[in-house]
């Protein structure tokens, strides 16, 4: 039953040097070649499935695994010193296959190793980690033979020749396996230079770190005061007599804001008083505002018993002056001041009548000054007819002179200051004719609100326009 051990396949005979720096993560045991071959043998021979028992030895931070496989009631132990469970199981399967080959007769059929595509994947992963080019496979076919295909793989500038195979795919897999075995054998570097087992324990990667030269640690930098304020003292400029002084982070009066923004000077706006004169040369009508004097008395509309010479005011109408804008409005000049026109009372006023004697006219008393409403339009007052008044007749016809607004009468704007008007001395027309004036007896003069007149330049409605003498103060 015992047969001499089968010589190693030709792919293991490749002793070409492998590139340095092989990583321990890529190992041949990941191909599961020996476990697969042992499983196939058990199925062909009608044996039970191989059972693997793996043991963990050594300290927890550096564990060492050892595996044992049981097949046909026979146990086979793996090599000691593996750092992972899979490598230990692959080693146990390889040992079992080597012993089975020795024990079976020569005519016994041992299935060949079924290569898998995992070897090609592992070789490509190794090339990527080593920054090598993708492995290239070159296959050749011989003229005759059971295994006509032979494949060669090149990685890292080194070519690895695989064993012969029946198909091109199997030839590439065998070439990849040969390259992996060569890389692993060169990286581990066995002491005797050769071994009959392919799966052998490797060196721990962690030990290489200890060989690195110890770098001299750099001295730590001393941190400066961590509680140092990150802002500097704020400086403020003096503006408009308002100074801000800062000493030892102490604020004084005048520093209202704790910010980096410079303080803006205080802008004082003076409101225009009532007596301010606004002159606007670009506008047609100018606005003149005047504050009424303090000694102005309100005309009581409901009082009937007034002074004997006082003018009666109707209860429904207050003494008011209405200013209605006319068509030809005279514009107040820009530099003209507020003009106050008063009609001064005359003593022993006499009205000259054309073609007749002058009649004596009694003066109408003046009660201080009527309060002119600020927000109302100025109105005109019409003097009503008196009972015992001698009416002057012009052209031998009785007619009352009503002072009505003329078309070309100069009327101030609604916002122009109200003017206080007093009756003046006898008015004389330029052609020598005197206007008809009505003498107002005691408690007889009544201010009529429906009819209005305009103060200022007044023109009578007669054929000859009368003229009044106005004194401007």
From Swiss-Prot:
UniProt xrefs under InterPro entries: dsRBD_dom
Bias-annotated ranges (Pro residues): 1-10
UniProt cross-references to Pfam families, sorted A to Z: dsrm
Signal peptide segment: none
Keywords linked to the UniProt accession: Repeat, RNA-binding
One cellular component term from this protein's GO annotations in UniProt: nucleus
Domain DRBM: 33-102, 118-185
Keyword Phosphoprotein: no
Region (Disordered): 1-22, 286-329, 393-473
GO term, biological process aspect, one: RNA processing
Recorded coiled-coil stretches: none
GO molecular function: double-stranded RNA binding; ribonuclease III activity
Basic and acidic residues bias spans: 286-307, 317-327, 416-427
Residue ranges, compositional bias (Polar residues): 433-450
The protein's role, per its UniProt record: Binds double-stranded RNA.
Protein name: Double-stranded RNA-binding protein 7
Annotated source species: Oryza sativa subsp. japonica (Rice)
């Amino acid at each position: 039953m015992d047969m001499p051990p089968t010589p190693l396949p030709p792919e293991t005979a490749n002793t070409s040097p492998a590139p340095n720096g092989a990583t321990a993560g890529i190992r041949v045991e990941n191909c599961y070649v020996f476990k697969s071959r042992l499983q196939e043998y058990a199925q062909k021979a009608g044996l039970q499935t191989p059972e693997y028992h793996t043991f963990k030895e050594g300290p927890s931070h550096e564990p060492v695994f050892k595996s044992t496989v049981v097949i046909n009631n026979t146990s086979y132990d793996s090599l000691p010193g593996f750092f992972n469970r899979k490598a230990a199981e692959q080693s146990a399967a390889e040992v079992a296959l080597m012993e089975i080959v020795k024990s079976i007769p020569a005519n016994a059929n041992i299935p060949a190793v079924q290569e898998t595509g995992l070897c090609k994947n592992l070789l490509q992963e190794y090339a990527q980690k080593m920054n090598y080019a993708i492995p290239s496979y070159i296959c050749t076919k011989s003229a005759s033979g059971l295994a006509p295909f032979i494949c060669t793989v090149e990685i890292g500038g080194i070519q690895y020749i695989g064993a012969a195979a029946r198909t091109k795919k199997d030839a590439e897999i065998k070439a990849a396996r040969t390259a992996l075995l060569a890389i692993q054998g060169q990286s581990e570097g066995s002491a005797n230079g050769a071994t009959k087992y392919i799966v052998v324990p490797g060196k721990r990667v962690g030990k290489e770190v200890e060989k690195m030269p110890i770098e001299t640690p750099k001295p730590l930098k001393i941190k400066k005061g961590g509680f140092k304020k990150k802002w500097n003292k704020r400086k403020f400029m003096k503006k408009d007599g308002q100074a801000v002084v800062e000493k030892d982070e102490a604020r004084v009066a005048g520093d209202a804001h704790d910010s980096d923004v410079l303080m803006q000077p205080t802008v004082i706006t003076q409101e225009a008083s009532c007596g301010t004169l606004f002159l606007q040369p670009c506008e047609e009508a100018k606005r003149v505002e005047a504050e009424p004097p303090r000694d102005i008395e309100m005309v009581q509309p409901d009082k009937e018993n007034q002074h004997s010479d006082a003018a009666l005011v109707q209860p429904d109408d207050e003494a008011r002056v209405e200013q209605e804008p006319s068509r030809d409005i005279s514009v107040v000049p820009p530099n003209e001041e507020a003009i106050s026109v008063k009609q001064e009372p005359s003593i022993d006023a006499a009205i000259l009548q054309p073609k007749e004697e002058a009649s004596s006219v009694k003066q109408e008393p003046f009660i201080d000054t009527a309060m002119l409403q600020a927000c109302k339009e100025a109105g005109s007052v019409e003097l009503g007819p008196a009972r015992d008044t001698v009416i002057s007749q012009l052209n031998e016809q009785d007619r009352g002179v009503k002072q009505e607004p003329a078309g070309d009468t100069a009327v101030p704007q609604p916002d122009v200051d109200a003017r206080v008007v007093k009756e003046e001395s006898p008015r004389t027309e330029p052609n020598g004719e005197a206007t008809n004036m009505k003498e107002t007896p005691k408690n007889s003069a009544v201010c009529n609100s429906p009819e209005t007149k305009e103060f200022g330049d007044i023109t009578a409605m007669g054929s000859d326009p009368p003229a009044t003498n106005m004194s401007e103060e």
